[in-house]
From Swiss-Prot:
GO terms for cellular component: membrane. Its EC number is 1.-.-.-. Glycans are attached at N219, N277, N320. GO terms for molecular function: heme binding; iron ion binding; monooxygenase activity; oxidoreductase activity, acting on paired donors, with incorporation or reduction of molecular oxygen. This is Cytochrome P450 monooxygenase 226. It comes from Postia placenta (strain ATCC 44394 / Madison 698-R). The gene is CYP226. Keywords: Glycoprotein, Heme, Iron, Membrane, Metal-binding, Monooxygenase, Oxidoreductase, Transmembrane, Transmembrane helix.
Length: 526
């Protein structure tokens, strides 16, 4: 029997199958890409409203450089409580309502507690380990604990004598030399913070550590300015040598970093050595933490403590200075408020003694004046930006991961629907209610896990200065050569911390008895 011819391989079937499979795969891939693009487009369409965005650059050319909170407030009247900006691909979400801020930054704080990465202030100038700049994590939580356990409501009473002594020295200094107003405010607030934090006594305006502290604060303010530094827009520049043309900012950052790290180590080491030998004032934050460690403080704990202490110093300095200057400016523009506040002090405290922080609960109008100072010219009008760690949805709007979240504190505290005549300084708007005042401080001192850990300590400093000034002096305008009173304009800087500019006045003692009481109260605390 003849063998049958071999059957040729059936090449056509597998080829057809492979072609069909490739076609299905290609169609599936295209469909997936289409779905992805449609989803991305849908997300983009569902983002919060905002100003028109140009292709590629978005809103980069529209971003305000001067007093951005005012521009954002105007946009809020058009786009609502939350709006979206795109600056060269960087997502920015601006929150203009306390209700929205509470929902996102408080209730959803697990994903809204990050910080945007800023190359200039962090990588280059070296402020990245301070609480205000750190991403949310273990070290930040540890630093906040170290501050909170020393400056809590149960412990701050031990520092009242320091705050009161500095307030009285401040007033005497301005009485003697009105031109020293800003210098006296800076020196005495620094004295309070450095004594409480490090046990270090500031010896005067020429004190080396005081001078370095002010310089560190000023450098932080410069380095953190948004939209100013090329390195923040092109982070790769941090790897370039500072001698290259056009990169002089890198050289400045090197100097800022050196000053920061050198001073941080020096003042911490001073505290450690002098707390042990009894030279430093006790208690102080650093010494208290080290004492609790009972000689077993790790290097990691000491580094966290060193940066936590520096945060209290630099973070407390500029915001407290801002608030006191705002208060003084308000008293110059609203003398009737000043008279009413003085009348309350006279009725409650009398003229036989100087007011104390312990009088605070009996002085609701003074508390209202302070709350109104926080509201009228908030120290941080855009707070400090948060960063969103995950995609999120709010009220049907898509908020993308990596967004910079900017709480527009200025608008929240100047919304005419909540605060009628928002540009007017009116302590009466609170009706003496601490609940209403707390609504202001809850906004002015930050949100969620990023709220100021030194709030109660700062309150004592501000109250002590405000009540001491009002009890003993009239805040009056300076007089020019023609006998005309010069009331300073309401002008302020464009920085992370708003600070009134060119505030000049005279502290005129209300009586010789008041001035004598100030002089007699000077003790060895400072």
């Amino acid at each position: 029997m003849q063998a049958s011819d071999p059957i040729p391989p059936q090449l056509g079937v597998p080829f057809a199958t492979s072609y069909a499979a490739l076609t299905v795969a290609a169609v599936t891939l295209l469909a997936a890409l289409l779905v992805h693009e449609l989803s991305a487009y849908s997300k983009r369409r569902s983002m919060p409203p905002g100003p028109f965005r140009w292709p590629l650059i978005g809103n980069a050319l529209q971003m305000p450089q001067i007093h951005p909170w005012l521009t954002f407030s105007r946009w809020a009247r058009v786009y609502g409580d939350i709006f979206y900006l795109d600056a060269l691909g960087q997502h920015i979400v601006v929150i203009n309502s306390a209700t929205v801020a509470r929902e996102l930054l408080d209730r959803r704080s697990s994903i809204y507690s990050g910080r945007p990465h800023l190359t200039m202030v962090g990588d280059l100038a070296g402020y990245d380990r301070m609480i205000v700049m750190q991403p949310y994590g273990d070290e930040l939580r540890q630093q906040r604990r170290l501050i909170s356990q020393t400056l809590s409501t149960s412990t701050i009473g031990q520092y009242y004598d320091i705050q009161e002594a500095a307030a009285r020295r401040l007033v005497l200094g301005v009485i003697d030399d009105p031109s020293s107003l800003e210098g006296q405010i800076k020196m005495n607030i620094a004295s309070i913070i450095m004594l409480v934090t490090y046990g270090y006594t500031v010896k005067g305006t020429e004190d080396v550590f005081f001078g370095r502290a002010i310089e560190i604060m000023d450098n932080l303010t410069l380095a953190a300015r948004p939209g100013v530094w090329l390195a923040d827009m092109i982070p790769q520049l941090k790897y370039f040598p500072s001698w290259m043309p056009g990169l002089s900012s890198l050289k400045a950052a090197e100097a800022w970093r050196k000053l920061l790290h050198t001073t941080n180590g020096m003042v911490y080491q001073w505290c450690k050595e002098n707390s042990e030998n009894g030279t430093a004032h006790l208690p102080n934050l650093c010494a208290s933490v080290l004492a609790q460690a009972e000689g077993k403080a790790t290097l990691q704990l000491e580094e966290s403590l060193m940066w936590a202490a520096l945060t209290v110093l630099s973070g407390g300095l500029d915001t407290n200075i801002s608030t006191i200057l705002s208060f003084i400016l308000a008293m110059l523009h609203y003398p009737d408020v000043q008279k009413k506040a003085q009348a309350e002090i006279d009725a409650v405290v009398g003229s036989g003694r100087l007011p104390q922080i312990s009088d605070k609960s009996s002085l609701p109008y003074i508390r209202s004046v302070i709350a109104e100072s926080y509201r009228w010219l908030p120290a941080t009008p855009l707070s400090v930006p948060h960063a969103l760690d995950e995609d999120d949805i709010y009220d049907g709007s898509f908020l993308p991961k990596g967004s910079i979240i900017m709480p527009n504190v200025w608008h929240m505290l100047h919304d005419p629907k909540i605060y009628p005549e928002p540009d007017a300084f009116k302590p009466e708007r609170y009706g003496g209610s601490d609940i209403e005042m707390k609504k202001v401080t809850d906004i002015a001192f930050g949100f969620g896990r990023r709220a100021c850990p030194g709030f109660y300590f700062a309150e004592g400093t501000i109250f002590s200065i405000v009540v001491t000034v009002l009890a003993t002096c009239d805040i009056v305008p300076v007089v020019n050569d023609h006998g005309q009173e010069i009331i300073p304009d309401i002008r302020y800087s464009t920085n992370v911390v708003l600070c009134p500019e060119d505030v000049k006045c005279t502290f005129r003692p209300r009586s010789e008895q008041a001035k004598s009481a100030l002089i007699d109260s000077m003790t060895g605390v400072l």
